[in-house]
């Protein structure tokens, strides 16, 4: 096959066509919600509000800011571990996220906040759009280094669409609880990406094996992403929870789960090395699995010790996955998972879904209180036949729906991305920035250089 990686026309045309289409659609459909509209002044009078502090902005913006940093800085830098793919990891993540949030505002708006004429946008819409793009960033990790930016734009277009449909089915039809997105974001994104990676299997990827590794400095850059994600994950899991106790509880639960996950990941990483040394791959990734696994139950009454247990289990499973499961997937199933998203997002996402089903099924008035139970699960008076067991079954069904949507959608999108005209690199040039980026030339000598002749290099 002849590979043509020149994107001079393909990438500009794809970006400009998509953006022009988005501008037209925003012009027709998107308007401000009341909290962002000049009529808010009148709304305050109608609702007898004396201050602007009741505006949704003041409740949601801190969480939105944290989630936004996670998407663009956290995920971007987490994938810079490849020694010659740092530009692409951060740059392509920036590209797909910027496109994805615009398309997500439209898709999620049509399905969830369309008033018959317009999509009304507020800060919660922006957070949900970031969540949607988070799922795309997860899938990007599975195909990192093996796809072109044009392929990523196409993948984002389809994945955002499928994510929005899946989210609507789970949250609006099945009415599951998934505030931190264990099922809708992580499990869906991971298995969608893994399925695409399976369809795009490269039999000669070993020709680029040398570049599919890290260096001391690239691992440090990736650790920056890990720390941003780890610090802000409580905001991620609580960002769209109900005001008050639910949001407060989600932050506490996530905090505890992440802390426990770090200790178990470090313990397993050392125990699995014959000399007891730590593997930076485990520290960068498995330490975050507790936030993923707690996502579905973040705002539920799992209690702090339950959060610690979830983090404990996710840390063990994720670390074991990096050691044993990733090589098995590549050698036996031909799934080339660059970032190990199966271990960080896939399996912990399933654990989170299972934890959600169990936690919902054992909910009771003694634990929540009568009003608290109704508020936590959104029980209306019309739901006379609601029961914790029924909610648990819906939670389990939601997990299966997410996995099915991911697998079927991944196959379809993978087949589309296999077409040879998207500018993808040949197997021997994967994981290489120079294929798509202008790379500055490295200086031949590290000696001091200056146009000032008074400054001389040190003598040898």
From Swiss-Prot:
SUPFAM superfamilies: Ammonium transporter. It catalyses: NH4(+)(in) = NH4(+)(out); methylamine(out) = methylamine(in); CO2(out) = CO2(in). GO terms for cellular component: apical plasma membrane; basolateral plasma membrane; cytoplasmic vesicle; plasma membrane. InterPro entries: Ammonium/urea_transptr, NH4_transpt_AmtB-like_dom, RhesusRHD. Its main location: membrane. N-glycosylated. Glycans are attached at residue 48. Residues 31-61, 111-125, 175-179, 241-251, 304-306, 368-396 are extracellular. It is a multi-pass membrane protein. It is found in: Apical cell membrane. GO terms for biological process: ammonium homeostasis; ammonium transmembrane transport; intracellular monoatomic ion homeostasis; regulation of pH; transepithelial ammonium transport. Ammonium transporter involved in the maintenance of acid-base homeostasis. Transports ammonium and its related derivative methylammonium across the plasma membrane of epithelial cells likely contributing to renal transepithelial ammonia transport and ammonia metabolism. Postulated to primarily mediate an electroneutral bidirectional transport of NH3 ammonia species according to a mechanism that implies interaction of an NH4(+) ion with acidic residues of the pore entry followed by dissociation of NH4(+) into NH3 and H(+). This is Ammonium transporter Rh type C. It comes from Bos taurus. The lineage of its organism: Eukaryota, Metazoa, Chordata, Craniata, Vertebrata. The gene is RHCG.
């Amino acid at each position: 096959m002849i590979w043509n990686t020149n994107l001079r026309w393909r990438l500009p045309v794809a970006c400009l066509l998509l953006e022009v289409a988005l501008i037209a659609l925003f012009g027709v459909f998107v308007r401000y919600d009341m909290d962002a509209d000049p009529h808010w002044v009148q709304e305050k009078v109608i609702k007898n509000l004396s201050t602007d502090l009741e505006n949704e902005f003041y409740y949601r913006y801190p969480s939105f800011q944290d989630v936004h940093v996670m998407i663009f800085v956290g995920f971007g830098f987490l994938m810079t571990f490849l020694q010659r793919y740092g530009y692409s990891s951060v740059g392509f993540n920036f590209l797909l996220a910027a496109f994805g949030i615009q398309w997500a505002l439209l898709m999620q708006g049509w399905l969830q906040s369309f008033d018959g004429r317009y999509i009304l946008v507020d800060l919660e819409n922006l957070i949900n759009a970031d969540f949607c793009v988070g799922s795309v960033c997860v899938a990007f990790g599975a195909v990192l280094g093996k796809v072109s930016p044009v392929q990523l734009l196409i993948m984002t277009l389809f994945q955002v669409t499928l994510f929005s449909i899946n989210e609507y089915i789970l949250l609006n039809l099945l009415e599951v609880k998934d505030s931190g997105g264990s099922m809708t974001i992580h499990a869906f994104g991971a298995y969608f990406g893994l399925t695409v990676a399976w369809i795009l299997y490269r039999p000669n990827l070993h020709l680029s094996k040398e570049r599919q590794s890290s260096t001391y400095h690239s691992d440090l850059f990736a650790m920056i992403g890990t720390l941003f994600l780890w610090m802000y994950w409580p905001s991620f899991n609580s960002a769209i929870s109900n005001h008050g106790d639910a949001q407060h509880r989600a932050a506490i639960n996530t905090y505890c789960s992440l802390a426990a996950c770090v200790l178990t990941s470090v313990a397993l990483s050392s125990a699995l090395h014959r000399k007891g040394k730590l593997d930076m791959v485990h520290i960068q990734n498995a330490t975050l699995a507790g936030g993923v696994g707690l996502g579905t139950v973040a705002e539920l009454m799992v209690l702090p010790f339950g959060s610690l247990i979830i983090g404990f289990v996710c840390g063990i499973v994720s670390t074991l996955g990096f050691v044993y499961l990733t090589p098995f997937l590549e050698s036996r199933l031909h799934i080339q998972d660059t970032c190990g998203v199966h271990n960080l997002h896939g399996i912990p996402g399933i654990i989170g879904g299972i934890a959600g089903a169990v936690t919902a099924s054992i909910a009771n008035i003694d634990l929540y209180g009568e009003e608290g139970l109704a508020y936590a699960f959104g029980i209306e008076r019309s739901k006379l036949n609601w029961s914790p067991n029924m909610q648990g079954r819906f939670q389990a069904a939601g997990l299966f729906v997410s996995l099915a949507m991911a697998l079927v959608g991944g196959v379809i999108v993978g087949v589309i991305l296999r077409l040879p005209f998207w500018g993808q690199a040949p197997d021997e040039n994967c994981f290489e920035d120079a294929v798509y980026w202008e790379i500055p030339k490295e200086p031949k000598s590290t000696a001091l250089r200056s146009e000032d002749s008074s400054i001389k290099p040190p003598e040898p």
